[in-house]
Amino acid sequence: MGTSGGAVVIAISLQKGGVGKTTTAINLGAALGELGFRTLIVDLDPQGNASSGLGVHAPDDAPTIAEVLRREEALENIIEPTAEKNLFVAPAPTGQLLAEVEAQLVAEMFPQPRLKDAIDACRDDWDYILLDCPPTLGRLTVNAFMAADTILATVQCQYFALEGLRDLSEVVRQVRTALHPGLEIGHYLLTMSEGTKRLSTEVESELRTAFGDRVFKAVIPYNVKLAEAPSMEMSVLKHASTSKGAKAYRAVAKELSNGRSPKAR
């Protein structure tokens, strides 16, 4: 996966807030960084939680992903380092600017691969690029899907979890048909699991029956340290390195990389 040895680009998505999407972007990114992979998180969520959760606060006059999507700035020019090893962020703007950009994208008769073009210009600089999508399936998310090699769906262990997957699958089908042949949901990650509680085990069983080995073996538990880490502006790997949450994301990173080695630099 990835083109010509360039980064693997993964869109992290589900049409619902609070399912562990941004938590996964931050902590999977940090875990990949620990393994030596140079990793970029592109913050496409208007709330900007991936940026703030890693201590990245772009000044009001600094270019952000909004300017990249408007084709006013190169992606490589907006990237900020984080305190995490090998982990960088392309920050979201504050305020309503991304919502305004999405309105501009909606006005286009045919979706343009704005984010894909920006990523393709610098993807050889990275091992992984994680796209933290908005909790809606609008044009920002479609732009992310057009840029992605694959999609990682975060699935909370709760009732109606699979309903959100059906909506996501339909949008992926539409993008695949019209814009990006070959796009698929390549990975499913169970989040906020309460272990042996009946609801968690039922959702996990249903997901594994439906999607087989596309579901990560590792499951992200409900873990207070995971909830605390964003307020500390760091990953759970840095905030509580030996916690269950940190161990789970390290396991996911190892599954995802699957023996792949970081590029020599």
Please identify what each model-predicted range represents.
Residues 1-265:
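P-loop NTP-binding core
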